[in-house]
Regions:
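A cross-kingdom feature marking solvent-exposed beta-strand/loop segments within repeated
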Residues: 82-105, 149-166, 231-243
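Terminal, non-catalytic domain-edge segments
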Residues: 33-62, 180-205, 231-238, 242, ...
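N-terminal secretory signal peptides that target proteins for export/translocation
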Residues: 1-12
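Bacterial N-terminal signal peptides
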Residues: 17-26
Length: 381
């Protein structure tokens, strides 16, 4: 009997201890306004939450952060974790920084913030978020060139940031948001009719710009550079190691956007077919990129390319215009034919090869081709 009573007391202690632990975790997880509360999510995970999240106090807290980070231009700067908990001092600094001219589309900035605020507004109907959204939309519309392209940064048009930019999905990200607005997708129904019409016009002009930028070699259309001249549409150089070239990476996002057009024009169909054919011609087979351990090196490894007959196809980040040969480059701006020839710092600090077009060719194109170009399958054997 005594053993039974002791066992019951032990069980109650375990239940009580467990309950207290759960309460402690809940308090830590839900804490807001303290200097160092437990983080729930980071900014790069904010768009991937379940629908119910966007009505929570945590989602609203992050959305209020996004409002603080919004510049007077209506856009946002890049490389900032906008989900972190802000102190009052942080907030004061952000209010003083409102007039900065560093709004950009680089690294998914601005269009990502618009998408997040749209989700929170749709769930909460808090007017301050709608007003911020309208300013963000106006920023995208104002930043567009008359020829339909978008610069990387606006209004700070200088250096390569003034070029029409496909790098890191800049222009495609802006166009995707504006198309959702133009089509009055549920999350974007907050926009008025005037802005919807402007968004639609901007998207159509953007498509025309994309088609004009497609690189033609010996009369044959290929794909796109990561950035193009804002006046002549020719491929342009960005950073010292990002030379004028045909991009095996950025072109994938461009083609996917064109494929998403409902009832595409003959010109859009031709652009897609030409780009897909180019991807098929320039794929690299029989090689694999690996990280080779080497304790003598700064990062403890080196990136090397080995022969491997079983390796799936890969694509180079950059191809030389005219030869379709992969190019690699150090900060000296001198193109090299192999990864091994460039500096260790650039070799390990940048993406030069990848499975960029794998799913585009294996999944996206077959589905698109059956619907919009059933008589011409460029990938059929």
């Amino acid at each position: 009997m005594a053993e039974r009573i002791a066992g019951m007391k032990k069980a109650r202690r375990c239940i009580l201890t467990g309950s207290l632990c759960l309460v402690a975790v809940a308090i830590a997880s839900g804490a807001q306004g303290r200097e160092n509360p437990a983080e729930v999510i980071s900014w790069n995970r904010c768009l991937g939450q379940r629908p119910g999240f966007y009505a929570t106090s945590e989602a609203v807290r992050i959305a209020d952060n996004v409002l603080l980070y919004q510049r007077n231009t209506g856009g946002w700067s890049k490389n900032v974790d906008m989900a972190r908990v802000l102190s009052e001092q942080d907030k004061a600094k952000l209010r003083k920084a409102k007039s900065k001219k560093d709004s950009t589309l680089d690294n998914s900035a601005t269009h990502t913030q618009i998408r997040y605020l749209a989700k929170v507004y749709y769930a909460t109907r808090l007017e301050r978020f709608r007003q911020a959204l309208l300013r963000g939309i106006d920023y995208l519309l104002e930043a567009q060139y008359a020829n339909g392209g978008w610069p990387q940064t606006y209004p700070g048009l200088r250096g390569y940031s003034k070029f029409i930019t496909f790098n890191d999905g800049a222009m495609i990200g802006a166009m995707s948001v504006l198309r959702d607005i133009a089509e009055k997708k549920p999350t974007y129904a907050f926009a008025d009719e005037v802005r919807r019409q402007k968004a639609n016009n901007a998207v159509q002009k953007g498509i025309e710009c994309i088609l004009k930028c497609q690189i033609v070699v010996n009369g044959k259309k290929t794909a796109w550079c990561a950035q193009h001249d804002e006046k002549t549409f020719i491929p342009r150089k960005a950073r010292s190691y990002e030379l004028p070239s045909i991009s095996g990476s950025e072109s994938v996002g461009v083609v996917r956007f064109l494929m998403s057009i409902d009832n595409p024009s003959p010109e859009a169909i031709e652009a897609i077919q030409s780009a897909v054919a180019w991807f098929g011609r320039v794929k690299l087979t029989g090689i694999r990129q690996i990280n080779k351990p080497d304790s003598s090196l700064e990062s403890g490894y080196d990136k090397v390319i080995i022969k491997d007959a079983t390796a799936p196809p890969v694509w180079a980040r950059f191809y030389q215009i005219g030869t379709n040969k992969p190019i690699f480059c150090s900060r000296d701006g001198i193109p090299k034919a192999t990864l091994a020839e460039i500096s260790y710092e650039r070799r390990t600090g940048y993406s030069w090869l990848g499975y960029y077009a794998t799913s585009l060719l294996a999944k996206d194109y077959p589905a698109w081709q059956k619907k919009w170009a059933p008589e011409k399958d460029l990938l059929s054997k």
